[in-house]
C-alpha cells in the first residue's frame, strides 16, 4: 500500500506528499489513522487534485481534529465504495457506507464505488407514465412521471421536507418498491424523525437511508448523494426493479461543492458558486435515470435561497427535471398546505395524449380560473368586489373554493394538525375538481373545501356548518 505524509492542513483540505512519486489517482480514498483522546479512528480523505510531481490535495470526509503535519497516510488504491443489495434495507448509512443506526453489523456481499459513469445512450429507455402520489394539487396540475425527475422548489420553512415525507409515506405504502433516501446537509432532527416515522409505519424494511447532515464537513455533504445513488443503481440494475430516490436537499449538494471548491483554491464564478457547478450537477443527475433493466424515479427537494429562483444553484437543477413543484410563501401564509403554487408548478406530461382528455381539460380550466382570480386581485384590492361583473363575482367565489380545495391533510402531519391524513386517488381528484369548476357546489361554504380529501369529504364537512 502506497504511503505518504501530511504536508499541510487547512480545515477539511489536506496536502499530502508521496515521496516515492507514486501518486494516487483522482477520487482514490486515502486512510489516516488518528488517536484523539485515546480513541482510535480512521479518517478517510478523497483525492481531488495533483499538485506538483509528488503531492496531492485531498478533502477529508470527516472531522480533521487531531491530525498533525507529518502524519502517515495510506492510499487504498480505489475510490470510496459502499455496500449494496438487500442487506442495506432498513438501515441508516453515512457517506462511507458505514451503518450509523447502532444496529447489528451488516454482512456485506458486494460493494460498489460511488464514482460511476452514467448509463450509455443505448441503455436508456423513456416511459411516459403518470406516477400517482395521492396529493391532489400535484396529481391534477403538475403530475409526476414514472422514472422521471421531480424538483420541489421552495424557500425556508414552506414545507419541502414535510411534502417529501408525505410522498415517502404514500408511495412506500401504495407503490411497494424500494426507496432510497439521501439526506444531504439537512437537519439531524429531521433525519431522526423520518427514521422513527418509517419504523412506526412499517415502511423502513423497504427503504435505505443515507445521511450526510448539516454538521458534517463539506466533503461528506458533497459525496453522500453519490453514495445513496450508488445503492439505488444496484436495485435498478441487478434486481431490475423500480426504485424511488428521495434527495433532501439538492441545494446543499451545490453548497457543499461551493465550500470544497473554495477550500481547494478554485476561482469562484457567479454568486460565489464553484466554476464546476453545472458539471457536478450533471454528473449526479445523469446517473438518476431509467434503463431497460429498471427505473429510478427521483424526487428532490431544492432550497431556493432568498426565494430567488434565478439563483445559479436552483436554476441549474431546473434543466434536469421533468416536473417542478414550486412551493410558495404567499400560499403558506394563507394557511394552505401543501403550499404548492398551482400556476408556477409544471410537468412535461401536461398534455391530453398522456393524461387523457378529461384530466387535461379539468386541469387547464382550474388554472384558467386561478389565473383570472390573480388578475382580478388588484381590482378587488382597490375598488372592492362590488365593481366586478356578475360573471367575475361567480369566478372569484369559485377560485377561492378551488384554492382551499387544493389543500390536503397529510398523514405525516397528523400529530401537529389533529386531522387524519388523506390519500386521494387520481380519478377522485379529477372527478372532484370537475364538479367544482362546473359550479355544482357553488352553494357550499368556502370553508367546507379546506383541508379535506375528495369532494365527498367537502360535502360531509359542509353538513356540519349547516347544523
UniProtKB/Swiss-Prot annotation:
InterPro entries: AAA+_ATPase (IPR003593), ATP-synt_VA_C (IPR055190), ATP_synth_F1_bsu (IPR005722), ATPase_a/bsu_AS (IPR020003), ATPase_alpha/beta_chains (IPR050053), ATPase_F1/V1/A1_a/bsu_N (IPR004100), ATPase_F1/V1/A1_a/bsu_N_sf (IPR036121), ATPase_F1/V1/A1_a/bsu_nucl-bd (IPR000194). It comes from the Bacteria. Its main location: membrane. It is a peripheral membrane protein. ATP binds at residues 154-161. Keywords: ATP synthesis, ATP-binding, Cell inner membrane, Cell membrane, CF(1), Hydrogen ion transport, Ion transport, Membrane, Nucleotide-binding, Translocase, Transport. It catalyses: ATP + H2O + 4 H(+)(in) = ADP + phosphate + 5 H(+)(out). Its EC number is 7.1.2.2. Belongs to the ATPase alpha/beta chains family. F-type ATPases have 2 components, CF(1) - the catalytic core - and CF(0) - the membrane proton channel. CF(1) has five subunits: alpha(3), beta(3), gamma(1), delta(1), epsilon(1). CF(0) has three main subunits: a(1), b(2) and c(9-12). The alpha and beta chains form an alternating ring which encloses part of the gamma chain. CF(1) is attached to CF(0) by a central stalk formed by the gamma and epsilon chains, while a peripheral stalk is formed by the delta and b chains. Produces ATP from ADP in the presence of a proton gradient across the membrane. The catalytic sites are hosted primarily by the beta subunits. HAMAP family: ATP_synth_beta_bact (MF_01347). This is ATP synthase subunit beta. It comes from Leptospira interrogans serogroup Icterohaemorrhagiae serovar Lai (strain 56601). The gene is atpD.
Amino acid at each position: 500500500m502506497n504511503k505518504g505524509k501530511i504536508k499541510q492542513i487547512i480545515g477539511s483540505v489536506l496536502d499530502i506528499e508521496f515521496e516515492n512519486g507514486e501518486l494516487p489517482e483522482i477520487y482514490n480514498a486515502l486512510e489516516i489513522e488518528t488517536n484523539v483522546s485515546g480513541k482510535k479512528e480512521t479518517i478517510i480523505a478523497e483525492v481531488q487534485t495533483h499538485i506538483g510531481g509528488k503531492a496531492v490535495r485531498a478533502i477529508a470526509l470527516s472531522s480533521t481534529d487531531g491530525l498533525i503535519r507529518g502524519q502517515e497516510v495510506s492510499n487504498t488504491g480505489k475510490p470510496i465504495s459502499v455496500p449494496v443489495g438487500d442487506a442495506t434495507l432498513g438501515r441508516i448509512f453515512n457517506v462511507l457506507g458505514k451503518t450509523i443506526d447502532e444496529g447489528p453489523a451488516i454482512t456485506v456481499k458486494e460493494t460498489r464505488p460511488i464514482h460511476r459513469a452514467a448509463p450509455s445512450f443505448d441503455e436508456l429507455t423513456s416511459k411516459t407514465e403518470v406516477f400517482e402520489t395521492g396529493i391532489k394539487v400535484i396529481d391534477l396540475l403538475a403530475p409526476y412521471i414514472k422514472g422521471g425527475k421531480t424538483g420541489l422548489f421552495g424557500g425556508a420553512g414552506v414545507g419541502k421536507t414535510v411534502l417529501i415525507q408525505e410522498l415517502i409515506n404514500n408511495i412506500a405504502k401504495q407503490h411497494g418498491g424500494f426507496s432510497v433516501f439521501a439526506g444531504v446537509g439537512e437537519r439531524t432532527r429531521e433525519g431522526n424523525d423520518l427514521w422513527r416515522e418509517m419504523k412506526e409505519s412499517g415502511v423502513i424494511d423497504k427503504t435505505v437511508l443515507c445521511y450526510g447532515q448539516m454538521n458534517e464537513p463539506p466533503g461528506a455533504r458533497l459525496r453522500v448523494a453519490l453514495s445513496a445513488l450508488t445503492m439505488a443503481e444496484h436495485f435498478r440494475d441487478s434486481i431490475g426493479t423500480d426504485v424511488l430516490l428521495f434527495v433532501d436537499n439538492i441545494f446543499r449538494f451545490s453548497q457543499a461543492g461551493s465550500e470544497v471548491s473554495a477550500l481547494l483554491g478554485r476561482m469562484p464564478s457567479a454568486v460565489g458558486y464553484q466554476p464546476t457547478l453545472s458539471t457536478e450537477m450533471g454528473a449526479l443527475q445523469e446517473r438518476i435515470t431509467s434503463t431497460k433493466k429498471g427505473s429510478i424515479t427521483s424526487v428532490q427537494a431544492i432550497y431556493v435561497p432568498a426565494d430567488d429562483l434565478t439563483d445559479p444553484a436552483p436554476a441549474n437543477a431546473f434543466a434536469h427535471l421533468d416536473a417542478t413543484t414550486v412551493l410558495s410563501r404567499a400560499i403558506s401564509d394563507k394557511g394552505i398546505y401543501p403550499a404548492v403554487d398551482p400556476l408556477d408548478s409544471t410537468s412535461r406530461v401536461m398534455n391530453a395524449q398522456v393524461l387523457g382528455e378529461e384530466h387535461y381539460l379539468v386541469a387547464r380550466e382550474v388554472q384558467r380560473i386561478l389565473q383570472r382570480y390573480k388578475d382580478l386581485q388588484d381590482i378587488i384590492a382597490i375598488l372592492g368586489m362590488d365593481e366586478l361583473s356578475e360573471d367575475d363575482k361567480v369566478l372569484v367565489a369559485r377560485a377561492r373554493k378551488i384554492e382551499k380545495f387544493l389543500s390536503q391533510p397529510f398523514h405525516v402531519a397528523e400529530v401537529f394538525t389533529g386531522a387524519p391524513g388523506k390519500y386521494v386517488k387520481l380519478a377522485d381528484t379529477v372527478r372532484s375538481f370537475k364538479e367544482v369548476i362546473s359550479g355544482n357546489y357553488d352553494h357550499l361554504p368556502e370553508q367546507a373545501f379546506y383541508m379535506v380529501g375528495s369532494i365527498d369529504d367537502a360535502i360531509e364537512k359542509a353538513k356540519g356548518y349547516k347544523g
